[in-house]
Amino acid sequence: MLNNYTKTYINQMARRTRTDITEMHLRVLEFAFAYYEKNKVGPLYTNIERHTGATKQDIHRLFPHGLKSVYTWIGIPIHSVDDTCKPVADIDVDEYREVYFDHNGTTYLRDEVKPFMEKYTRGDYGHGNPSSSTFLGKNAFEKISTARSEIAASLSVNPHEIIFTASGSEANNLGVKGIAFKYHQTKGHIITTSIEHSSILESVHFLGMLGYEVSFLDVDENGLITEDAVRSALKSNTILVAIMAVNNEIGIINPIKEIGELCKLAEVPFMVDATQAYGKIDLKPKEMGISLMSVSGHKIYAPKGIGALYIDDMYSVVPLIHGGGQEFNRRSGTENVGHIIAFGKAATLARKEIQSEYKRITELRDYFIRQLKEKVPGHIINGSIHNRVPHNLNVGFPGIDSGTLLISLNKIGVYVASGSSCSAGSKESSRIIKALGVDTDYYGTIRFSFGLNNSKEDVDYLFKYLPEIIEQIKDN
């Protein structure tokens, strides 16, 4: 029911616009108010018609500015129906279930890892200060050493080449700035791409402000960074090349080995953000010409707040955090022992499962695409369908607000990531989607990323409701 404040405001707006309030006006306004109170977003025309009988034409006849007037008269906090997230779909769900299709964003703590975290939390082991000489401290140090060996084994590198950090972002900062600061007097030239993770981009922008020269490479029509593009950008004063292995938004696999060989010949350090590749594809930095490589725990079912940086024996970095000299004097601060232990166990499991999971996820992805083609005509898949990890599908839906679709899917228990905050074509539209030449004013993009617990039943659940959701929210 409308509260007294809202009723007073409605009467004021009616007087200002010289609108005579009828029973139909009140029916529409009361429904819209109740809908917003429940869903925190205004209803669509189809929602209003279904529950009140008022058609789109009726609403534009009854209210001076159509749906916008309905929203403003009852105090829905938007400035315009057109430049914000639009009303979400109203779907009746038969058997509700939760489906998590956002594994590129983060993953849950897998069951096999939980016991190690629980033992640490209870204080059963590993809770001493690893820098101390006590028995508890030595035990914690040994647990870290074991985890370091587990991470190293997953990359076929030496344990002492693994530096633990608080996140993948910190690892990226340490890799990029740690190399660049060695040249703080002469500066130098850095090559990266326009589609890197923000922890890389912001780092090189910062270095640019300090006087370093930075070249940003663009992707080709398939979303790839080519070896030729890197070769053309190399200069005599290039001090670092930083390129991601797998793109977080469209899942494209860059030709890292070829670029690594090129950098090795040019004697230029090669930094790779492998956050989205680690645990999905085989990574062997020493065979790929990679000098530094960042990985993150929460992308492979380990806890959040733990990452690592591989630094080849041939290279050193200037530390960003000074203090007690932990992590071979490269990253000071008492180590997060429990998370490091869990990271090591998750890395071991990922290493064992990498081939079988790749095959299973590929079959699941292909099944998803078949359902997509059959039930959602007019869509596009962003990026090459062949040269990508199967764990990721970035789909463009014509005439759809990606933010509205994301919220509509959330309401039925399906969790995904959108290409922009509220609408395709907004200022926050993805850099890489634009770089591919996609019309972001027309296509709203959604990223579906698959993981360990996803099944065909999850895909079936999504496509049971997706066509109706799209029908309700699409621009006509």
For the regions a protein language model found, what residue spans apply to each?
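Short helix-coil-helix linker/hinge
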Residues: 21-23
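Helix-rich interaction surfaces within compact, conserved domain-sized segments
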Residues: 44-90
